């Protein structure tokens, strides 16, 4: 794919290639389906992953192309193992909302996650 995607590519061209995405019953699938539909294109996943962290290994095995958060792919992009495909259409910004129950104590993992999310939000 490295030679095919040196220049920005349209979503219309992108759907000609095998596509890896989360399953149809996920908000991520709905998010990208809407993104493609806003540009008049029907998105279909050739391969569905159960979790977001399964997409990158599938891409690395040349099973197709997929959307994942940039921080998850940054290292392998920098190493030249995979490429970031430049798009003509600007992907929509995706936001998350952090909610918590302040009436009960949080686990250490929950506190670490909360801290990571807030640090990531401060960078933007």
Go through each PLM region and give its residues.
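Hydrophobic hinge/microswitch elements
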Residues: 31-85
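Secondary-structure junction motif
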Residues: 3-5, 18-39, 106-108, 114, ...
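Short beta->alpha junction loops/turns
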Residues: 25, 48-51, 89, 103
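A late-sequence structural motif
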Residues: 83-124
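Short amphipathic alpha-helical segments
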Residues: 15-18, 43, 94-97
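Active-site-adjacent beta-strand anchor residues
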Residues: 21-22, 48, 66, 99
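Acidic, Gly/Pro-rich loop/turn segments at junctions of secondary structure
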Residues: 1-17, 91
